[in-house]
Swiss-Prot record:
Keywords of the record: Acetylation, Actin-binding, Cell adhesion, Cell junction, Cell membrane, Cytoplasm, Cytoskeleton, Membrane, Repeat
Protein name per its UniProtKB record: Gamma-parvin
Annotated compartments: Cell junction, Focal adhesion; Cell membrane; Cytoplasm, Cytoskeleton
Organism listed in the record: Homo sapiens
Annotated region (Disordered), positions in chain: 17-39
Subunit architecture: Interacts with ILK; the interaction promotes the establishment of cell polarity required for leukocyte migration. Interacts with ARHGEF6; the guanine nucleotide exchange factor activity of ARHGEF6 is essential for the PARVG-induced enhancement of cell spreading.
């Protein structure tokens, strides 16, 4: 290996292992995201905004994404997401267990996406292979393009760019190069924080908001059934904190002594005590993605109530999905 190639490889950041030469065909290239790029605040924010958008879109289908890198590769979530965004039905099997069937499903979905975006295959910054191989950059390029096409008012962080390491197999060995990859458009305006996903939800048509509420009410009633309780009105029935505390106890395995809360609160102060206790429990469990005022819950603010229940919904719907998913699928 010539000195310049050795020097290039020595520039790889700690934590990025150079591939063996046999992993790349001659002339082949592969991108790596160094740890410093992964930890870039704007890069992390972009992933967060996209995940919240996907989860809000797929909430009526009880589908929850926890990781864009790990959850998108097999085409299942992309299939459901694109069908809902484009309001069409794709001829692809719902469940694909083998690598071959997953790639076929992904091919069908990406061909439909590219047609919708009016892109030739060579123009797209993603491919079946890159998505299937869990290439985070390709996945982000794809999701950003879908968001711009189907929800242009989604407030993505602007000018997100990350440093990537490109490894190329040449006649003389492996050569590395540092490049900057642009993920979202540059804006000359002062960057604004992304809009809250629930603020965006409540700007949609009432039937879409109601569909989300209905999905969460169904989830809550499934969990409260063993207690002989049910919820009909999400906006009002959580205001005193009692059902919220009982729901948290059921889902998170907490035993709450009756001395710790008011089972039949008779005043706003007692209701506020219950709701404050519930929010503290959720915060301790990492289930509050952003601050919620207990007064808003007591005052029957639908958006705040929905935000609180959404954290529980995501965690336990995802857990149920993992429990049902077969492991060790054959290739």
């Amino acid at each position: 290996m010539e000195p310049e190639f050795l020097y290039d490889l020595l520039q790889l950041p700690k934590g990025v292992e150079p591939p063996a030469e046999e992993e790349l065909s001659k002339g082949g290239k592969k991108k790596y995201l160094p740890p410093t790029s992964r930890k870039d605040p704007k890069f992390e924010e972009l992933q967060k905004v996209l995940m919240e958008w996907i989860n809000a879109t797929l909430l009526p289908e009880h589908i929850v994404v926890r990781s864009l890198e790990e959850d998108m590769f097999d085409g299942l979530i992309l299939h459901h997401l694109f069908q809902r965004l484009a309001a069409l039905k794709l001829e692809a099997e719902d469940i694909a267990l083998t690598a071959t069937s997953q790639k076929h499903k992904l091919t069908v979905v990406l061909e439909a996406v590219n047609r919708s975006l009016q892109l030739e295959e060579w123009q797209a910054k993603w491919s079946v292979e890159s998505i299937f191989n869990k290439d985070l950059l390709s996945t982000l390029h794809l999701l950003v393009a879908l968001a711009k096409r189907f929800q242009p008012d989604l407030s993505l962080p602007t000018n997100v760019q990350v440093e990537v390491i490109t490894i190329e197999s040449t006649k003389s060995g492996l050569k590395s190069e540092k490049l900057v990859e642009q993920l979202t458009e540059y804006s000359t305006d002062k960057d604004e924080p992304p809009k809250d996903v629930f603020d965006e939800l409540f700007k949609l048509a009432p039937e879409k908001v109601n569909a989300v509420k209905e999905a969460i009410v169904n989830f809550v009633n499934q969990k409260l059934d063993r207690l002989g309780l049910s919820v009909q009105n999400l906006d009002t029935q959580f205001a005193d904190g009692v059902i919220l505390l009982l729901l948290i106890g059921q889902l998170e395995g907490f035993f709450l002594h009756l001395k710790e809360f008011y089972l039949t609160p008779n005043s706003p102060a007692e209701m506020l005590h219950n709701v404050t206790l519930a929010l503290e429990l959720l915060k301790d469990e990492g289930l509050l993605s952003c601050p919620v005022s207990p007064e808003d819950i007591v005052n029957k603010d639908a958006k705040s109530t929905l935000r609180v229940l959404y954290g529980l919904f995501c965690k336990h719907t995802q857990k149920a999905h993992r429990d049902r998913t077969p492991h060790g699928a054959p290739n």
